């Protein structure tokens, strides 16, 4: 479909959803989530936060069918016909979406104890140039590491290393195999750091805050199934995000 065609198709889908909701209301079922709910999440975030609670959500709403997809790219809700997306970004300015911030995360530097014992622990940001740095890559991430300190200093550093990957999970595995230092999101490393498999490096520095948002196609009407998901996210996912982030503060 062209962009115009995709927009038209989404508008038609919204009209049909409104008609279905009106019919359900007339039959006293407006508040009962049912039908198909299409959810999109960034893959690594979804693995940590969505997967553990998805079965319970489906059991709570047995008349719902959840179509759950993952993506590393900026979601195009209009083209994909997605009802609601979970998305991570430092800034969000796309007027096509209705956004609600549900939490904040950040990324931190970490390495394995064995790597640090062999190559030494960096004492300053300049020392990172002497180390093997493993980097995430996707369209929303720059080739540099942008770091901020507790006293609001900002630092940007070009890094080099033996590995560039598009998923935090792969980098996490490689860091645990003593390959180098990586800048990884809190949710990806929290268990490894808690158990001692990884250690935080240059703990006074981290990435800028990254907002976690629920995104919906920009519209005034939100049907019962989408409302149920938004409520579930706020009750179960938001507190977990907050707890994980506060662990590192």
Residues of each region from the PLM?
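Alpha-helical "hinge/linker" immediately C-terminal to small N-terminal DNA-binding modules
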Residues: 1-28
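Central regulatory/effector-binding core of bacterial HTH transcription factors
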Residues: 35-94, 246-249
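Short, well-ordered beta-strand segments
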Residues: 38-40, 85, 134, 182, ...
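Alpha-helix/helix-capping structural signal
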Residues: 43-44, 113-114, 169, 187-188
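Acidic, Gly/Pro-rich loop/turn segments at junctions of secondary structure
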Residues: 69-165
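Alpha-helical segments flanking ligand/cofactor-binding loops in enzyme cores
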Residues: 100, 126, 172-173, 227
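Hydrophobic hinge/microswitch elements
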Residues: 156-200, 207
